[in-house]
From Swiss-Prot:
Positions of region (Disordered): 30-53, 119-139, 502-534
Record's function text: Transcriptional regulator which is involved in the sex determination and X chromosome dosage compensation pathways. Directly binds to five 5'-A(G/C)(G/T)(T/G)C(A/G)-3' sites in the promoter of sex-determining factor xol-1 to negatively regulate its expression and promote hermaphrodite development. Together with fox-1 is involved in making the distinction between one and two X-chromosomes. Plays a role in the fox-1-mediated repression of the functionally active isoform (isoform b) of the sex-determining factor xol-1 gene to promote hermaphrodite development.
Occurrences of domain NR LBD (ranges): 252-493
Gene3D superfamilies recorded: Erythroid Transcription Factor GATA-1, subunit A, Retinoid X Receptor
Location in the cell: Nucleus
Name of the protein: Steroid hormone receptor family member cnr14
GO molecular function, a single term: RNA polymerase II transcription regulatory region sequence-specific DNA binding
Taxonomic path: Eukaryota, Metazoa, Ecdysozoa, Nematoda, Chromadorea
Biological process terms in GO annotation: cell differentiation; dosage compensation by hypoactivation of X chromosome; hormone-mediated signaling pathway; intracellular receptor signaling pathway; negative regulation of transcription by RNA polymerase II; positive regulation of transcription by RNA polymerase II; primary sex determination; regulation of alternative mRNA splicing, via spliceosome
Disruption phenotype: RNAi-mediated knockdown results in 43% lethality of hermaphrodites. RNAi-mediated knockdown together with fox-1 results in hermaphrodite embryonic lethality. This hermaphrodite-specific lethality is suppressed in a sea-2 bp283 mutant or sea-1 gk799 mutant background. RNAi-mediated knockdown results in hermaphrodites lethality due to failure of the dosage compensation complex to assemble on X chromosomes in a fox-1 y303 mutant background. RNAi-mediated knockdown in a background containing one copy of the fox-1 gene results in the viability of 3% of hermaphrodites.
InterPro entries: NHR-like_dom_sf (IPR035500), Nucl_hrmn_rcpt_lig-bd (IPR000536), Nuclear_hrmn_rcpt (IPR001723), Znf_hrmn_rcpt (IPR001628), Znf_NHR/GATA (IPR013088)
Sequence ranges of Low complexity compositional bias: 119-130, 511-534
Keywords in alphabetical order: Differentiation, DNA-binding, Metal-binding, Nucleus, Receptor, Sexual differentiation, Transcription, Transcription regulation, Zinc, Zinc-finger
CDD domains for this protein: NR_DBD_DmE78_like, NR_LBD_Sex_1_like
Amino acid sequence: MSFETKPNYLLLTNPDTPLSVCTSPYYSPSGKTASIPSSEASKPEGTNGQWSHLPTGATYVTDEFSSEFQIQNGSTAAQSGNANNYADPLSHRRYFNNVNGYNHHQFYDTASQASVSSPATSVTSSLSPPDSLSNGHTTQRHHIGKAISFCKVCGDKASGYHYGVTSCEGCKGFFRRSIQRKIDYRCLKQQVCEIKRESRNRCQYCRFKKCLDSGMSKDSVRQMKFRNAMRDDKSPDSVFVPEISTLERQEEVDAVYEAVLRAHTTFSFYTDIKIRSIVARPFNVRINEDSKMNRLNAWQIYAHEIDVDIKEVVNFVKEIPKFNFINGNDKAVLLRKNAFPLYLLRIVRGMSNRGLMLRDGRLIDFKSLQLLYGSLADEMLAFANHIITIGCTDGDIALFIVLILCQPLTTEQQFSTNFKSQLQLLEMFDFYKKVLFQKMTCRIDGCDTYKQLMKCIHELNRLNELHKQQLNILRENLSFLNLPPLVVEMFQLSTLPLPVNHNNQENQYTPAPEHQSPQPQQPTPNQQQTPVHC
């Protein structure tokens, strides 16, 4: 609708007539009424009408305005100084009111500063009046610029959010170089230098200190450096850094992590807290002149300790989130394939130069450990020391155990074991790799630890092959041993000895029937059965 002439509006000759719209205390241009009329007290809320005055002093009420209207030249409202403006007779300020349905109550100190704005003008145009009143029909648009942010360190204009703080490019680069180069600064004064844009280069110690005080994170620099290195490294041994998708929310990652850590703490004797509370005591193994007898004797005793841990591994696997998507037969295949790597990861905190600490405090000295595993014992100790040295927590070890268990099988391994859950296994492996990455990179030096831990996958698989070779002596003498059936099954001891030189990571095997111990073979007349001393 448009403001044309007086007949288009309902005239209210009596200003005290009750109005159905919001009124103002200074509605009369003649200034004869300086108080708030009684009609304001009875105004209803939520109406869209307007009110104004004619030069004669008569009050009129407009209809509910539409989204667009124009003030035309020559109209009564425009000639009277724009129907959307009214003057304060006391302060001589002119108020700008009701543009496009909004009541801004914008005012100017003098009438000459008031603008005649087209109703089609945006709201921001009313805040910036034009220099002249003559151009009443020209639409003027003024845009509010983006707010300028300043560097929290030096006060210069910020370029973005860097390393956890709004900062400029100069302080961003300075902080990154200081962390990557591990520079040790010194202050020549009292470490209270003022850091401003003009003086930020005078004292690097105080500037670096203010970067840290402002909230810049050293870990953010290390994580960025690690990601860039992984992106640029195209070698086969490079570590893949997974990206956390939006579907794997932080809540899900935390829930999975807590479930795995809780299961590991419940079904492991070698957590950080438990191993510290164990009191060591000697574990005697009877030593004879025959080295073969000694080794078989040691395994006869040691196998029962492994049997207990294998049962705990099975209980741990039952609590792994998402592992129920894999059928029971395929779970057994994965456990048999990775039995030794899982066992080694679980006992890393129990191994030392002294030997292996058992769950009840008995200590298998390192000499006896070499009797059991041969040269593999030295590599087991080196691997355990490496895991502890790089700073793996119980949570890291628990997630890494799941990751090793979920390693995808080769095509040959799938065929030989009739494995059916390869797709589900790939999804689980990728998921737990992302969970492990996210949890480890949240702490200082977590990126470097993650990178080193991923390289341990290849080392674990290599040790697994060496372990299979070391157990050939048990396969050859299985008829003379009374080993727990679960140990025989998990380590595949009922098959023929494995060749030393082979290319496959795992040879074909025929699992022994569960819950049945292997039948002892009758010795030939030329052989004499050797008793086993426990």
